[in-house]
Each structure stands twice: as structure tokens, then as C-alpha cells.
Regions:
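Surface-exposed loop/turn motifs in large extracellular/passenger domains
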Residues: 153-157, 179-187, 199-209, 214, ...
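Sequence/structural signature of small/polar-enriched beta-strand/turn repeats
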Residues: 52, 61-98, 102-111
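Short linear proline/tyrosine/threonine-rich motifs used for host-factor recruitment
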Residues: 248, 253-255, 261
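Short glycine/acidic-rich loop motifs that flank beta-strands on beta-rich extracellular proteins
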Residues: 62, 67-70, 74, 155-157, ...
Length: 647
């Protein structure tokens, strides 16, 4: 060092002197706030307070920050208990390696419930009153928002929701959520909240054992429904609301005298009017700020979500691809009374496992940008509609998703008129996409809904070891047009590829069972499929089928049992190019005339499969023929049979 200084002093003596003077000043100066330190707070601190980067803050009795703006980076906080240490505070910078509780931010765990009568006004003739318990308590919105701000930009934090914390529902439709931005390695656990979470650009986040509820205890509610007709002058809806003193501004009904605003938008658009249905909005909303990275590795485990519009939602903006999330894990959670979807995904590499749901409109939505998602052991009852995979029009980025070991029961408990109801809706996908349905059970029981079957519109689907039970008694098509009652089918189709050529799907069915309960007539069992390969498939029940295959380009079925008496195996006019397979049994309705369309080469197929009712021919009468008129006799008719066909 002496050599270096000597050489430097010989070349730049003035500069060396200045540097040495500056170093001496720093060494001799007293400690300042820019140095990392252990800070003990033993009094009430207000105003703005800057904590040296990397410092540790501890608290003594009576010590806290109040109405304070606190700044600092990588600050560690040791609260020394659960009392309030941040009272109405805001934060700038970041905190790390700290463990706190909700009450440290001034939240008061006094939420309880009182009996209440909840009134739903969802239309001119729909009024429902439910006896419920309404939550009440201290409004902890500001305190919990402060907790979220503390977590933002933080690293390795643990937050305990140590109690039940009430928050007033924001009736103007804001997210009403604890907002956390750009945090990493944060764990939040326990307790009950009326406020959900909104995470932007967060990484390695864990939520454990949290209950997120709505304004009231869980109870069945009528889905809010509207269409454009209700806003037309003179409509029943228009007369109803105007007679009650409301006017419509294009978005909601407003009472000028009271200021009450009632928005009847349903499903995607329910933003305002949450108080009308007693719901909170998303329990967990996960996305990305365009200026930061996507949210990744979010774990939600052992949580319960009730009376919300949505449960867990990963958000994506189609116009900004970096607004995506990835690697979401939702396990051991329960969802009930969810207005729309417990699971709504716009993200990739998701794992949903061991979850249950009840009274939900649609249990699982793998929507735009949802790909490589596994939903395993998800059991849902009282669903309005079945799960789906879907994309924005023109996009191919929802692909390679799977439902495994799941069960979905679709009933009339949640019903909206004029809506198409699918057991499963799978749409879009890439050219190499394969949607998988494995070891699942579906049931559809309705006297109201327009059953649309399994709508599979992706490029390829594999369905294995699954069962589908269909009980449709009073079909939508008859209810809409009484003039055709008794003529229209209960079910238009069971499996439908839907698309026009050449976008129709390739579908593989292996060990799949379709059971018709109260359903009496199916028009087409398999409809508009490019290539259908079926092995060990059973179609059985109480009904009949007009056709088993219609507009299915190539059919290869083996060891299947088609037990519904049909009028045709392949519909007349179908564009089927080939039908192959062996070891199948087809039951055929008496009086059926043409089982295959003209021109389809089906001789080998007819030879290698058993086609007919499997009923034995009636025994011949031993009695002598009798005649009703002289010279004419009545002879018992003999059934037309062959070695393979039995009518």
C-alpha cells in the first residue's frame, strides 16, 4: 500500500491529499442514519421516518409508528408480540426476514355475525328472501391494506392472520383486496377474512389455512341474470324497475331519490352490485404488472372460499403477454357458493389437486393462456355447468390440459334461462394439443337445462376410464317450442366436435361408459368428429338413439357395446368415409331400415360385429291358422333375422 500511495503522490499530490482528507472525515464523523443498525422503538413515532438499509427494528412497550411513512430497504422487523406497532402507516422500500401478525398493523379481530333477512331482487317476478347471518365488526380495510403494502417488495416474510377480520364490502366494485406487489418468499396463513388478495408480479408466495368469506354466511342465492331484452322500453324488466322509481343509464338501474344503484350484470360483468348478492369478489387474484415479472410459484393450500364471485383467478391481458402467471398450485381447498368459477386460470403449468366445491356455476375454467394444467381429484357438486378449456378467438395458447380423478355433478340448483349447458367444453388448442380426461365421473341431472353434451372442439382429446350419466327429462327444446313436444329429442348429441371441416377433432375413447337415466331420446351419440377411435365403450340406459355416428369422418370402434336401440348406426347423409372395428354389439330399434348411408362400404363391419336387438324371434304358434274372413287366414308374422342382424 505504501508503494502505491508513494507512486500516486508523486504523480497527483493534490488529488491524494484531498482523498486522504475525505477518508479521515468519514472515520472521525459520528454515526449517522445511513448505516445499518439495530433500532429500538420505545415511543410513538409519527411523520416520515427513514430506516437505514439492512437494519433491524425492535419494539418496546409503548413503542410504535403512527400515521407514519416509513422507508428503508431490506429492513428486518421484530414485533415482540401481536400488539399494534404500525398504526395507519404507509411503506416505501422493502422488508425482509420478518414474522408479523395482522394485529401488528392495527387490525381488530372482532368479526361476528347477526341474524338477517337477505332480499334478492333479480327481476320483475323473482324475489327471494333468505334467512342468513350477516357479518359485522370493525372495518379493517385500511389496516389490511397497510399489511399488503408492508409485504410489497418484501422478501422472506411470514404473516399470521390471527383472528377473524371484518371488512366493509366496497359497493363501487373495486377489487376490495389486500394488494401485494413484487414480493418474494412470503407466507400468509390462518384466520378469516372478508377481504381477498390481489398479487401482481409476486414469486414463491404461500397461503395456508385461510378462510375468505362474503358479506353473509353461505346460503343458496339466485344467479343474477339479464339480457338486452330487459332494457328495452316496455319490457317486463323495464316496467318493473321504472315502477319502483329507477331509471337505467346503460349500465345499471339507479334510484334518483335514494341514490341506490343496482347492477344486474351477470357472470363476467358482475363488478358493481355485489351487495345485491352478498358476495365478495375474487378471493385470490394473481397477475403481473407490465413493468415487472410474471407471478410465479404461487401456492394456496388448505384454504376455504365462500360467497365470492370467483375463487382463485390467474389474470391475463391478451394485449400484454407479460401479464401472465405461471406455476400455480391450489391444493386441499374447499369452495362453496361461488357465483361464477372457483378456479379460473389464464396461466401455465398449474396444479390443482384434492379440492372440493359445492354450489358453483362452473367448477374449473382453463381459459386463455391456460396450458399444461393438471386438475387432479377435484370433486364438485351442484354445478351450474361443466368445466371448460377455452381461448379468445384466434388464439391457440390454451393447450395440453388434463382433468384426472375428478367428479362433477351438474344440477338445476344453479339455473339461468337461455344458456347452453355443457357437461364439458373444450375449445381451441394448438395443432399438437391433446386434452386429456382421465378417471373422471360426470353427471347431468336436469328438468330445465338445454343439455349440450361433451363439446370437444380442440385438435385432439383422449378420454379414458370415465363415466357420464345423463338424466334429462324435460328438454330445453320442448320447453321453448311446445308445438314440437313429443317430436324433438331430449338430447341433441352426447359427444360433439362441433367445428366445420377440417377443424374437427380427433377423439380417442378408452373404457368409457355413457349411461342414460331418465333421458328418453338421443339424436346423435357422436357428432362432427374427424377421427373417432373407441375401445371398450358402453352406451346404455333407458333411451333410444336416432344415430350413433353422424358427420364423423373416420370411425374405428372395437369391443364396444351400444345398447340404445338405434334407427341408424351411421346417419344417412353423414360424410363418413370409413367404419372399421371388431367385437362390437349394436342394438337396433325394430323397424329400422337403413343402418348405414348409401355408398359407405360397411360389409366387413357388418360381418365382424353383432348388430341387432339380441332378442329371440317369437315362437311359432302351434294352433291352426284362423281367419276373420272366408278364404283369408291370419298367420303370425315371423321376425326377419340373420346371423348378425336381429330386429
Amino acid at each position: 500500500m505504501h508503494t502505491i500511495i508513494t507512486a500516486f503522490s508523486q504523480r497527483r499530490p493534490a488529488r491524494l491529499a484531498a482523498c486522504l482528507a475525505a477518508v479521515a472525515a468519514l472515520l472521525l464523523a459520528p454515526a449517522t442514519g445511513v448505516q445499518a443498525a439495530t433500532i429500538v422503538v420505545d415511543r410513538v413515532i409519527t411523520g416520515s421516518y427513514s430506516i437505514p438499509d439492512g437494519s433491524t427494528v425492535t419494539f418496546k412497550a409503548g413503542g410504535k409508528f403512527k400515521n407514519c411513512r416509513i422507508s428503508g430497504a431490506r429492513v428486518r422487523v421484530v414485533p415482540g408480540g401481536t400488539r399494534t406497532i404500525f398504526d395507519n402507516c404507509t411503506f416505501a422500500g422493502s422488508f425482509s426476514n420478518s414474522e408479523l401478525s395482522a394485529t401488528n398493523f392495527g387490525a381488530v379481530p372482532d368479526m361476528d355475525s347477526v341474524p338477517s333477512t337477505w332480499t334478492y331482487r333479480t327481476g320483475p317476478s323473482t324475489v327471494m328472501r333468505a334467512s342468513v347471518y350477516r357479518y359485522r365488526g370493525t372495518d379493517n380495510g385500511a389496516a389490511l391494506a397497510s399489511m399488503g403494502a408492508f409485504c410489497s417488495n418484501g422478501v422472506n416474510l411470514t404473516l399470521h392472520i390471527n383472528g377473524k377480520f371484518y371488512t366493509r364490502i366496497n359497493q363501487q366494485g373495486s377489487h376490495n383486496a389486500i394488494a401485494i406487489d413484487n414480493a418474494e418468499g412470503v407466507t400468509i396463513e390462518g384466520g378469516t377474512l372478508l377481504m381477498g388478495f390481489k398479487m401482481w408480479s409476486c414469486r414463491r408466495m404461500t397461503f395456508k389455512g385461510i378462510s375468505i368469506v362474503g358479506e353473509t354466511t353461505a346460503h343458496d342465492f339466485p344467479p343474477i341474470y339479464y339480457n338486452a331484452d330487459q332494457y328495452k322500453a316496455g319490457s317486463a324488466w323495464d316496467k318493473f324497475w321504472r315502477a319502483a322509481g329507477y331509471t337505467h343509464d346503460g349500465e345499471a338501474w339507479t334510484n334518483a331519490a335514494t341514490g341506490e344503484r343496482i347492477d344486474l350484470k351477470y357472470l363476467y360483468n358482475i363488478k358493481r352490485g355485489l351487495s345485491l348478492v352478498g358476495l365478495g369478489n375474487e378471493a385470490f387474484l394473481i397477475g403481473a404488472n407490465p413493468h415487472y415479472l410474471p407471478s410465479t410459484d404461487i401456492t394456496i393450500d388448505g384454504c376455504r372460499v365462500s360467497m365470492r364471485t370467483l375463487g382463485v383467478m390467474t389474470a391475463a391481458d391478451p394485449s400484454a403477454h407479460n401479464w401472465r402467471a405461471t406455476r400455480l398450485s391450489v391444493t386441499n381447498c374447499h369452495f362453496d357458493h361461488i357465483y361464477y368459477q372457483p378456479i379460473a386460470l389464464h396461466s401455465g403449468y398449474n396444479h390443482i389437486a384434492h379440492c372440493t366445491a359445492d354450489y358453483v356455476f362452473q367448477p374449473v375454467d382453463m381459459s386463455t393462456y391456460a396450458h399444461n394444467t393438471l386438475v387432479d381429484d377435484f370433486k364438485a357438486t351442484r354445478c351450474g355447468i361443466g368445466p371448460k378449456q377455452e381461448n379468445h378467438s384466434g388464439s391457440d395458447e390454451s393447450h395440453d390440459n388434463e382433468l384426472r380423478n375428478c367428479s362433477f355433478a351438474i344440477t338445476d340448483d344453479i339455473y339461468l334461462p337461455d344458456v347452453m349447458y355443457e357437461m364439458l367444453w373444450v375449445r381451441q388448442g394448438r395443432a399438437d394439443d391433446c386434452f386429456k380426461l382421465t378417471n373422471c365421473k360426470f353427471s347431468f341431472t336436469s328438468t330445465k337445462k338445454w343439455f349440450r353434451g361433451l363439446m370437444i372442439l380442440t385438435h385432439k382429446a383422449i378420454v379414458s376410464n370415465c363415466q357420464f350419466t345423463i338424466n334429462v327429462k324435460d328438454p330445453y327444446v320442448r320447453a321453448k317450442d311446445p308445438a314440437i313436444s313429443g317430436q324433438a329429442p331430449d338430447v341433441n348429441w352426447i359427444v360433439n366436435g362441433y367445428n366445420a371441416e377440417p377443424q374437427r377433432p380427433d377423439i380417442t375413447l378408452d373404457n368409457v361408459r355413457f349411461v342414460l337415466g331418465t333421458t328418453s331420446r338421443v339424436q346423435d351419440v357422436f357428432f362432427k368428429i374427424k377421427n373417432l377411435k373407441a375401445t371398450a365403450v358402453t352406451v346404455e340406459g333407458n333411451g333410444t338413439a336416432d344415430n350413433y355416428f353422424d358427420h364423423t369422418r373416420a370411425i374405428d370402434v372395437n369391443k364396444c357395446r351400444f345398447d340404445l336401440p338405434c334407427q341408424a348406426i351411421v346417419a344417412a347423409g353423414s360424410n363418413t368415409a370409413s367404419v372399421t372395428g371388431t367385437g362390437n354389439t349394436f342394438k337396433v330399434a325394430r323397424g329400422a331400415k337403413s343402418l348405414f348411408p348409401a355408398g359407405l362400404k360397411s360389409q366387413a363391419f357388418e360381418r365382424d360385429n353383432t348388430i341387432g336387438s339380441q332378442a329371440t324371434a317369437p315362437a311359432r304358434s302351434k294352433a291352426k291358422p284362423t281367419s276373420s274372413k272366408p278364404g283369408r287366414s291370419r298367420v303370425p308374422q315371423r321376425a326377419v333375422t340373420s346371423s348378425k342382424w336381429h330386429f
